[in-house]
């Protein structure tokens, strides 16, 4: 099974993540930030990646460390579960509509982390979550996972819908990219022979 467990303890956060790439989208998420929990639940459900996340963070200071470290830990778990990446589809993309909103996400499990974020969030918060941290979550996740990630909100007005479409787009793109290609199940999807 392609699974991973990550424990990450710093002076700012204590995190435990369990991930199963070949799951059913089952989740148990407790970050202490309600809207982040909601987004990670969407990520799990729509990627079919089972995800357990438990964080005890320094929320009495602010949400930055919890947001950043959750992205790092989930990204590390994804990279660990992928192992040598043998047989994966590697690329994934998705258009994620949500009411008036449409977001496009494309990714490459390349081993070359990069994030392009073209999402304009107008308000300072979603629930209690600082919206400036949302881009940072995606950057932290992509860096730790070793993926090239492009997220572009094409249009939309409701911030909740915009952010949720970003996470659902990521989920659907990941679902495709981590799948085993039955025609190439024993090979690395790169002419270099490694990712």
Swiss-Prot record:
**Class in the EC hierarchy, top level:** lyase
**From what superkingdom does this record's organism come?**
Bacteria
Where does this polypeptide localize?
Answer: Cytoplasm
Keywords for the protein's UniProt record, in alphabetical order: Amino-acid biosynthesis, Cytoplasm, Histidine biosynthesis, Lyase
Q: Which GO terms describe its molecular function?
A: imidazoleglycerol-phosphate dehydratase activity
Q: What is its EC number?
A: 4.2.1.19
Question: Which reaction does this enzyme catalyse, per its entry?
Answer: D-erythro-1-(imidazol-4-yl)glycerol 3-phosphate = 3-(imidazol-4-yl)-2-oxopropyl phosphate + H2O
Query: Which pathway does this chain act in?
Result: Amino-acid biosynthesis; L-histidine biosynthesis; L-histidine from 5-phospho-alpha-D-ribose 1-diphosphate: step 6/9
Q: InterPro entries from the entry?
A: IGPD_sf (IPR038494), ImidazoleglycerolP_deHydtase (IPR000807), ImidazoleglycerP_deHydtase_CS (IPR020565), Ribosomal_Su5_D2-typ_SF (IPR020568)
Q: Which GO terms describe its cellular component?
A: cytoplasm
Give a GO biological-process term: L-histidine biosynthetic process
Pfam families according to UniProt: IGPD (PF00475)
Q: Which PANTHER family match?
A: IMIDAZOLEGLYCEROL-PHOSPHATE DEHYDRATASE, IMIDAZOLEGLYCEROL-PHOSPHATE DEHYDRATASE HIS7
Concerning NCBIfam families, the annotation shows: PRK00951.1-5 (NF002109), PRK00951.2-1 (NF002111), PRK00951.2-4 (NF002114)
Question: Which family does the record assign?
Answer: Belongs to the imidazoleglycerol-phosphate dehydratase family.
Q: What is this protein called?
A: Imidazoleglycerol-phosphate dehydratase
Query: What gene is this protein translated from?
Result: hisB
């Amino acid at each position: 099974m392609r699974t991973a467990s990550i424990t990450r303890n710093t002076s700012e956060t204590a995190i435990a993540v369990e991930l199963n790439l070949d799951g059913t989208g089952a989740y148990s998420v407790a970050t202490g930030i309600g809207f982040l929990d909601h987004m990670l639940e969407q990520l799990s459900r729509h990627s079919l990646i089972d995800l357990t996340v438990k964080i005890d963070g320094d929320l009495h200071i602010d949400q930055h460390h919890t947001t950043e470290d959750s992205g790092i830990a989930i990204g590390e778990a994804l990279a660990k579960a992928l192992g040598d990446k043998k047989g994966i589809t590697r690329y994934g993309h998705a258009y994620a509509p949500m009411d008036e909103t449409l977001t496009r996400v494309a990714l490459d499990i390349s081993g070359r982390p990069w994030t392009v974020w073209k999402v304009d969030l107008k308000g300072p918060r979603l629930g209690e979550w600082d919206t400036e941290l949302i881009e940072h979550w995606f950057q932290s996740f992509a860096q730790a996972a070793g993926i090239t990630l492009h997220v572009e909100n094409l249009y939309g007005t409701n911030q909740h819908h915009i952010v949720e479409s970003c996470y659902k787009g990521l989920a659907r793109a990941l679902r495709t990219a981590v799948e085993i290609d039955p025609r190439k199940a024993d090979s690395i999807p790169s002419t270099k022979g490694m990712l």
